[in-house]
């Protein structure tokens, strides 16, 4: 599995990492911390055997990736065991999703995951993963006590493979 993800300014990264750490401490589920998952928002998830072609494609089109603003407004869940922060789906995020999808379709063997296609996508930043029912309740309580609407700036986009995580390409914006 491969991912295209965006990353945030230092203040936002610190804030989201704080939520991740508090959720892990409250219930003793260190999955996100142990896996060294940095705060991010995944734009696309896909399968391919053409890793080098994807890297070349992103390098050729790097100028189309620009910084943008995101407003984080809500907390959500993918049941039964994922808790996340959700931004407003603004023009910046929608257009970025569409651009990445359109570019990836130029590579014959790319298969984009059905939940990461434009207009079939839930933008989110995972706070807790593989949470039990009790851990989900505790995680919601942490965010109920600490979360408030905030804005952030996207400062980097990257292409990576998972299991184990390895960044293959990036652009600092």
Residue ranges of each PLM-predicted region?
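Acidic/polar active-site rim loop that often engages polyanionic ligands
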Residues: 78-81, 119-121
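Glycine-rich beta-strand-turn "strand-cap" elements at beta-sheet edges
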Residues: 75-78, 154-168
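Histidine- and/or cysteine-centered catalytic micro-motif in compact active-site loops
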Residues: 46, 75, 88-90
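Basic, often amphipathic N-terminal segments
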Residues: 1-69, 92-151, 167-173
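A structural detector for beta-sheet-dominated domains
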Residues: 7-9, 73, 88, 155, ...
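Short hydrophobic/aromatic beta-strand or adjacent loop that forms the aromatic wall/cage
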Residues: 3, 82, 156
């Amino acid at each position: 599995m491969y991912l295209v993800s965006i990353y945030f300014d230092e203040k936002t990264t610190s804030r989201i990492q704080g939520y991740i750490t508090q959720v892990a401490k409250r219930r003793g589920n260190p999955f996100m911390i142990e896996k060294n998952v940095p705060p991010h928002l995944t734009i696309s998830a896909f399968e391919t055997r053409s890793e080098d072609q994807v890297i070349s494609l992103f390098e050729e089109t790097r100028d189309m990736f620009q910084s943008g603003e995101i407003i984080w407004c809500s907390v959500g869940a993918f049941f039964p065991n994922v808790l996340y922060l959700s931004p407003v789906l603004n023009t910046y995020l929608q257009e970025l999703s569409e651009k990445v999808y359109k570019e990836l379709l130029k590579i014959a063997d790319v298969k984009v995951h059905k939940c990461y296609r434009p207009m079939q996508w839930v933008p989110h930043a995972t706070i807790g993963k593989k949470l039990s029912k009790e851990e989900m309740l505790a995680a919601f309580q942490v965010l109920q006590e600490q979360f408030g609407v905030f804005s952030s700036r996207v400062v980097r986009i990257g292409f990576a493979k998972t299991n184990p995580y390895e960044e293959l390409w990036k652009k600092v914006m």
